[in-house]
Amino acid sequence: MKFLFDYFPIICFFVAYKFWGIYIATAAAMVVSALQVAIYWIRFRRFEKFHVITLIFILLLGSFTLVFHNAIFIKWKPTIVYWIFAIVLFGSHFFGKHTLVHRMLKEKIELPAKTWSRLNLSWALFFLILGVLNLFVVYNFDTNTWVNFKLFGTLALMLVFILGQAFYIARHAQNLKTNSR
């Protein structure tokens, strides 16, 4: 359910684009992202960092898109957000006792430190590549292809990557249990 909630602004953007075009879709995504943050706050009395970061950039770049009537601003939003995630993930190797992925999942999964480090770096690399891939699609294909890639392409890549991470975690969690006997 959280997955759908997280993807709701993208889904609304996609639907609005298909019916009314990039500018209405941009405005819709701006409104829905703000609603998403508000609903999350009302429900949990806290903010989800991912939602807030996305909201900031969709409001900023969405406003530029609407004011200047140029879709390039909204097309850059995913790349900027992905690269911020990559920088934060990579930077967590140098700040604090544990990497960001370790801090996020340590209550749920027990893994060796080396495995946590590799997971964190793989997520950082994944977001870096996803940002580059978004720019490749932006500058080499039309807006319709970019919108389809934004929903279906990134979703498929994310699911495949998460599945690969799950297998990697399962293998190393199994090794950890075997080695501790």
Curated annotation (Swiss-Prot):
UniProt KW Cell inner membrane keyword: yes
Membrane topology: Multi-pass membrane protein
Subcellular location field: Cell inner membrane
Pfam families cross-referenced by the UniProt entry: IspA (PF04279)
Keyword tags: Cell inner membrane, Cell membrane, Membrane, Transmembrane, Transmembrane helix
GO annotation, cellular component aspect: plasma membrane
Chief location: membrane
Membrane-traversing stretches: 8-28, 53-73, 76-96, 121-141, 149-169
UniProt record similarity statement: Belongs to the YciB family.
Purpose: Plays a role in cell envelope biogenesis, maintenance of cell envelope integrity and membrane homeostasis.
Name the UniProt record assigns to this protein: Inner membrane-spanning protein YciB
Lineage: Bacteria, Pseudomonadati, Pseudomonadota, Gammaproteobacteria, Legionellales
Record gene name: yciB
